[in-house]
Amino acid sequence: MAMQEKYPTEGISHVTSPSSDVIQKGSSLGTEWQTPVISEPFRSRFSRCSSVADSGDTAIGTSCSDIAEDFCSSSGSPPFQPIKSHVTIPTAHVMPSTLGTSPAKPNSTPVGPSSSKLPLSGLAESVGMTRNGDLGAMKHSPGLSRDLMYFSGATGENGIEQSWFPAVGHERQEEARKFDIPSMESTLNQSAMMETLYSDPHHRVRFHNPRTSTSKELYRVLPEAKKAPGSGAVFERNGPHSNSSGVLPLGLQPAPGLSKPLPSQVWQPSPDTWHPREQSCELSTCRQQLELIRLQMEQMQLQNGAICHHPAAFGPSLPILEPAQWISILNSNEHLLKEKELLIDKQRKHISQLEQKVRESELQVHSALLGRPAPFGDVCLLRLQELQRENTFLRAQFAQKTEALSREKIDLEKKLSASEVEVQLIRESLKVALQKHSEEVKKQEERVKGRDKHINNLKKKCQKESEQNREKQQRIETLERYLADLPTLEDHQKQSQQLKDSELKSTELQEKVTELESLLEETQAICREKEIQLESLRQREAEFSSAGHSLQDKQSVEETSGEGPEVEMESWQKRYDSLQKIVEKQQQKMDQLRSQVQSLEQEVAQEEGTSQALREEAQRRDSALQQLRTAVKELSVQNQDLIEKNLTLQEHLRQAQPGSPPSPDTAQLALELHQELASCLQDLQAVCSIVTQRAQGHDPNLSLLLGIHSAQHPETQLDLQKPDVIKRKLEEVQQLRRDIEDLRTTMSDRYAQDMGENCVTQ
């Protein structure tokens, strides 16, 4: 916008264009600027460069001494040369932020057909005026003001890149490397200049800056240097429109005169032709990127505002919760407070970093202004003013943030104090609850101790009763054995019959003995006679033996002849064969006997297994029978007690008169007695059903076995006086007696069956 104001002293004819009305409206509605006149050395340099470009010289044959002399002569002035006396410092009512600005506001020139599609005549006139060195036409030419905002490189006819400024000495190059202006947000003064694009691509100059890569990391903390999301590789820190041609807006690129120049570069117009469609595309892309920057800044402010607002940690009223829940709520609140404190510290650090960066930028701007020659004073002054406005904007933003942080800190301190009070109250309530809980625990422990004592007493009683039952059981077993050993009537009759039979047999044997004695005498006489005969026979045998000896002698004489040994060998062979056959037969018989013995052993083992199983079964039956006996005894004892209690209850009922109301003590005792009788009756019924089920071979009911009963409401005192209640209880007792009789018969039948099976197995 500074280039679009009119100079009051110079009356230069300007070129009219469709967008000039818009620029005049924006300048009249906005703030009034007094733009300084460009100094003569800078203007002569601009005209010199343009004349070189018009002549078509490639600057190859030209020496660098003339250019260096001009530059040195222009830089011979003091380092910070003030502007002319008749030019005032531009002043304006600067807005604190450009976030709310849009292309439709008066300070910004809208992009439309009037600004995007410029006539070729206006472009040609502006180009001619620039080449002739008349810089006064710049304030009326919309395309030329845009051209001054961009420095783009173009390739000449001979393929050598051109530069606007000549080469300088080594000291200037080193000083140029020390300072790079960061990319800043576009302000009100830059918005109109950035939206007014110069449409002639022949006058775009490529400005080579080798330090742009190093300056990217210097101002990363500033919100203007952040990369917009979704812009891709097009939006960089050096500006929203950095492409291959190097076109950068003035507010978003380093200063033009501070980069390292190349000695072989001269300014020369580009041979490319002008295309309206390309200009419209550039306008649209630039407009979109500016909108992206604005939206990004708005989002950052909204995020900073949202950070300062935090809801209350506790509600107005606290619900009644358990101590564990209160502790968890307190822990979460403490965690939130710690997070908020960390966030506040981070914001403070960020603000301090921003302040440091602003101070560094101010120092760099002042050092750059003091170290630059006079021809760059105008551009640097404009840049300094823009940076000062940015500085005021950042200071205002810093003040807002500090105020918001202080308010938030006060709110957080209030919430912290309230939460501490609530924590104190919760702790007190927790202490009271813990005391009550400890008292209840002590009471429960005392109750448990009393119950343990009662249980121990009951266990001792149960042990005594079990010992008594064992003694009784042993006595019963001894009596049963004694009764089993006693003979019965049948045994006595059998023994008497056997005695009579044995007496008859003894008489018969006596008679036989007499007969045998007589026979013995007769046989003795016969034996005597036979002995006499034997003696005679012995004598004859002696005679025969003598005769045999004589015969043997004769036979020995005959054997000498040779026929006797063969006959004897044949006889011995026959005897050997017969004996061998006998041995084989005996061996076969032995094998048969062995197989029979093995089969018999197997049968014996099987019989032993079956006998063992029968013994185990008999033992199990004996144990079951023993249990049944003990259960029957217990039932009989309990039945007897129940009958006695029933009789006493009947006596009490008879003694009680129906007309006169009973005393409260007797009524209470009667009620307790009735309750005890009802519980005993229920227990007896349960035991009876369990024993019956076991006797029948079924599994018992676990609820009855464990003594689990359903909750029953006790009978009131009025129920005892009703005859229906008494009749119902009597019916239950009679039914219990019948169950006991059935159980007794079942157990006796089972016992008889077991005894019969044991007798059969024995």
UniProtKB/Swiss-Prot annotation:
Residues 434-476 are annotated as: Required for centrosome localization and for its function in the suppression of centrosome disjunction. Its main location: cytoplasm. Residues 334-657, 723-750 form a coiled coil. Residues 257-433 are annotated as: Mediates interaction with NEK2 and is required for its function in the suppression of centrosome disjunction. Residues 14-26, 98-111 have a biased composition (Polar residues). Acts as a regulator of centriole duplication through a direct interaction with STIL, a key factor involved in the early steps of centriole formation. The CEP85-STIL protein complex acts as a modulator of PLK4-driven cytoskeletal rearrangements and directional cell motility. Acts as a negative regulator of NEK2 to maintain the centrosome integrity in interphase. Suppresses centrosome disjunction by inhibiting NEK2 kinase activity. This is Centrosomal protein of 85 kDa.
